[in-house]
């Protein structure tokens, strides 16, 4: 990860943090090295990522190799599920299962907090990757994701917020379970 990748990641975490209460139990999907839990030491939970070689523990979280929802423990009662720069990397058939899978693990009024890039982002990332300013992690996996479809993917949830950030190249969505 380049310094610029790290900067962008920290911005995504800061955007999500505004919607997480102190002490929140969070399930972080596509957690990578556990950056959300490393940055936000006042939350706890579980991180899961299919790219991890092995599972490990942080002071405030267990981070495990695996895929959601199949490999997540049968725990329920999370205050939030986060997908920061993850949704656009998921195949369409997995995206379609997220609403039900997230609802199953969340408390009533629990939140799905996610960031997804705008359509124009892929072109900019491709240029930045060419100049080695970003790694463009799995850029080829964006599946042509259309950010406008995000609300319908979480149709059983109430949309709480939609904000653009990073000069309009990124979007934050917050959906609440009824």
Feature roles, as predicted:
Residues 85-89:
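Short catalytic micro-motifs in class I SAM-dependent methyltransferases
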Residues 113-134:
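Conserved class I S-adenosyl-L-methionine
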Residues 96-108:
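A short glycine-rich, Lys/Arg-flanked "PGG" loop and its adjoining helix->strand segment in the class I
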Residues 54, 90, 120-122:
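Feature marks short, surface-exposed loop/turn motifs that line or immediately flank catalytic pockets
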Residues 21, 90-91, 106-108:
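Helix-to-beta-strand junctions that scaffold the AdoMet/dcAdoMet cofactor pocket
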Residues 25, 109-111:
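Short glycine-centered segments of the SAM/dcSAM-binding site in methyltransferase folds
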């Amino acid at each position: 990860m380049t310094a610029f990748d790290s900067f962008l990641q920290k911005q995504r975490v800061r955007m999500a943090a505004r919607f997480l209460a102190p002490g929140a139990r969070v399930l972080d999907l596509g957690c990578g090295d556990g950056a959300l839990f490393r940055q936000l030491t006042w939350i706890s939970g579980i991180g899961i990522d299919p790219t991890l070689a092995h599972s490990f523990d942080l002071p405030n979280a267990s981070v495990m190799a695996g895929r959601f929802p199949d490999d997540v423990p049968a725990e329920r009662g999370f205050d939030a599920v986060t997908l920061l720069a993850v949704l656009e990397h998921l195949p369409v058939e997995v995206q379609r299962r997220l609403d039900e899978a997230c609802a199953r693990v969340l408390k009533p009024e629990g939140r799905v907090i996610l960031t997804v890039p705008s359509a124009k982002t892929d072109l900019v990332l491709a240029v930045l990757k060419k100049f080695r300013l970003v790694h463009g992690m799995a850029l080829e996996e964006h599946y042509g994701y259309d950010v406008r479809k995000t609300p319908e993917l979480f149709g059983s949830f109430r949309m709480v917020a939609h904000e653009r950030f990073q000069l309009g190249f990124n979007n934050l969505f917050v959906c609440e379970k009824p």
